[in-house]
């Protein structure tokens, strides 16, 4: 008889022994407590080299879901680009050179934009520093930087030392300037909040209510208003000539390598067919370089990604299983696009259900997010499927606020929903595996009681509802082979990692 299975991916829930600042350990979680005590479980590595990132680099949702679906370690953006820097191939990149030549030929400034931090989730400031040196050595005369404050994958107010480093570098180049600053809340939205994105976009054009002549002074001004890096109000540098802000035919390099939060701003600049929203102040440029491919955005791509040709969902579909993908808006792309290898696959016998995320200023005020509605939908339609991949977003998204009490509440709400799923699975003859894509909620306050808003390097869980099996520890790349093994299906030869189900000798 064909087994029916749910793969529950909890976003941003790692395992950490210390209870201080630990939104998981401090929460009341009777369901998780019972699962850990009574059911097969093991530890899963979800960061650093184990998921294709640099050593010590915290995991993230994109990389986590890619590895879960691939069955092998997927080397992504930061690792590919860092390797190009190490080998020197970065400084031979034809797409960058094309943008440089266009700037030199036309006399228009090169516009470089992206998330400015060492967070390594969406971008890395070292890549920007390398681009500046590359452009200068190639002969680019004018260069404008449009920096997005992070405050999420790094500390909430951590940008100043890096701006000071950047200013020291820019002193070497007469017409290289920080032209605009905005928070990622504006310039990197992914929830179709185009009213926000347009404010970030307008700053690229030199149109903003806020202005500055010294970036550090502006950052201090924002801090005095209680505004952290993530939420910097878009502002422009009065020392930059109006005609030198982004305009028709200016070459652009977007140095974010992760696509999901780069697509909307890229769409406004290029006016693609990806979204209906059009900018109120359109410009036209044919020289737009993205660091990696942004799905749905037709532009020059500096670095090619690793290809996942035979992800878990494809093999499940080929085996004749009817499958469902279920998540709320914040993580919908992750249980579809990313878990399928970073491409939009149309799979036979496969449905997708999107539950709308709440449109709010802060998820700390709504720690439940859409967890209840997701569970409701599973209980309503789940029995119609053989294999389900679902995601709960609230430990990660609430953890990103750095609000420990709200994170504890988010975990407690999640625990109750997992309990509902356990009962449903038993009634409907479903099995389930629970894992997570990376850590976050388990470290929401540092040792000094300050908010910690970033992901972590702690391992995550793998729990099975089947008491007849035993699990060994592994990494996210072991998840797909484990699922296939459990369902009695062969893994694809591309999957070089093994099942974590311990076989009797």
UniProtKB/Swiss-Prot annotation:
Binding site for Mn(2+) 1: 396, 400, 455
Name of the coding gene: gpmI
Function: Catalyzes the interconversion of 2-phosphoglycerate and 3-phosphoglycerate.
Family in the record: Belongs to the BPG-independent phosphoglycerate mutase family.
Catalytic class of the enzyme: isomerase
SUPFAM superfamilies noted in UniProt: 2,3-Bisphosphoglycerate-independent phosphoglycerate mutase, substrate-binding domain (SSF64158), Alkaline phosphatase-like (SSF53649)
Keywords: Glycolysis, Isomerase, Manganese, Metal-binding
EC number(s) from the headed UniProt entry: 5.4.2.12
Subunit structure, interactors included: Monomer.
UniProt GO cellular component terms: cytosol
Protein name according to UniProt: 2,3-bisphosphoglycerate-independent phosphoglycerate mutase
GO biological process annotation, one example: glucose catabolic process
Any GO molecular function: manganese ion binding
PANTHER family, per database record: 2,3-BISPHOSPHOGLYCERATE-INDEPENDENT PHOSPHOGLYCERATE MUTASE
Organism: Mesomycoplasma hyopneumoniae (strain 7448)
UniProt key word Nucleotidyltransferase: no
Pathway info: Carbohydrate degradation; glycolysis; pyruvate from D-glyceraldehyde 3-phosphate: step 3/5
Keyword Transferase (UniProt): no
Catalytic activity: (2R)-2-phosphoglycerate = (2R)-3-phosphoglycerate
Cofactor(s) essential for the protein: Mn(2+)
Binding site for Mn(2+) 2: 11, 61, 437-438
Cofactor binding mode and count: Binds 2 manganese ions per subunit.
Record: active site: 61
Record-listed substrate binding positions: 122, 152-153, 184, 190, 258-261, 331
Superkingdom assignment: Bacteria
């Amino acid at each position: 008889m064909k087994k029916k299975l749910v793969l529950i991916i909890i976003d941003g829930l790692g395992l950490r022994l210390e209870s201080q600042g630990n939104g998981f350990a401090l929460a009341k979680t009777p369901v998780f407590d019972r699962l850990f005590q009574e059911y097969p479980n093991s530890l899963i590595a979800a960061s650093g080299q184990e998921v294709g990132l640099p050593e010590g680099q915290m995991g993230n949702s994109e990389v986590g879901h890619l590895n879960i679906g691939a069955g092998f370690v997927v080397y992504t953006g930061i690792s590919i680009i860092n390797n190009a820097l190490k080998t020197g191939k970065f400084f031979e990149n034809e797409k960058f050179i094309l943008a440089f030549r266009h700037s030199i030929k036309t006399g228009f400034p090169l516009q470089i934009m992206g998330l400015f931090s060492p967070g390594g989730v969406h971008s890395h400031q070292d890549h920007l520093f390398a681009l500046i040196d590359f452009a200068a050595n190639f002969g680019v005369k004018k260069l404008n930087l449009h920096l997005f404050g992070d405050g999420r994958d790094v500390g909430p107010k951590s940008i100043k030392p890096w701006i000071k480093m950047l200013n020291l570098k820019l002193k070497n180049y007469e017409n290289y300037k920080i032209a605009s600053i905005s928070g990622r809340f504006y310039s990197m939205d992914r929830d179709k909040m185009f009213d926000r994105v347009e404010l970030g976009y307008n700053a690229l054009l030199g149109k903003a209510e806020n202005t500055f002549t010294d970036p550090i002074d502006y950052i201090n001004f924002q801090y005095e208003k209680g505004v952290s890096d993530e939420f910097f109000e878009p502002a422009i540098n009065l020392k930059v000539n109006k005609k030198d802000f982004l305009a028709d035919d200016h070459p652009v390099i977007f140095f974010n390598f992760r696509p999901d939060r780069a697509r909307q701003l890229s769409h406004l600049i290029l006016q693609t067919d990806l979204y209906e929203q059009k900018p109120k102040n359109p410009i036209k440029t044919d020289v737009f370089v993205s660091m990696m491919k942004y799905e749905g955005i037709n532009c020059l791509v500096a670095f090619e990604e690793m290809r996942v040709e035979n992800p878990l969902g494809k093999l499940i579909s080929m085996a004749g299983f009817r499958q469902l993908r279920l998540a709320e808006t914040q993580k919908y792309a992750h249980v579809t696009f990313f878990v399928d290898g970073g491409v939009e696959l149309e799979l036979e016998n496969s449905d997708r259900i999107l539950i709308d995320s709440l449109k709010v200023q802060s998820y700390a005020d709504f720690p439940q997010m859409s967890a209840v509605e997701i569970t409701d939908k599973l209980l309503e339609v789940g029995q119609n499927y053989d294999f389900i991949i679902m995601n709960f977003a609230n430990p990660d998204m609430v953890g990103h606020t750095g609000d420990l009490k709200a994170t504890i509440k988010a975990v407690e709400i999640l625990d109750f929903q997992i309990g509902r799923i356990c009962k449903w699975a038993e009634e409907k003859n479903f099995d389930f595996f629970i894992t997570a894509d990376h850590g976050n909620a388990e470290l929401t306050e540092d040792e000094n009681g300050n908010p910690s808003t970033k992901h972590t390097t702690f391992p995550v869980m793998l729990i099975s509802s089947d008491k007849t099996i035993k699990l060994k520890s592994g990494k996210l790349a072991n998840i797909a082979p484990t699922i296939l093994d459990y369902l009695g299906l062969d893994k694809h030869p591309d999957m070089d990692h093994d099942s974590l189900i311990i076989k009797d000798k």
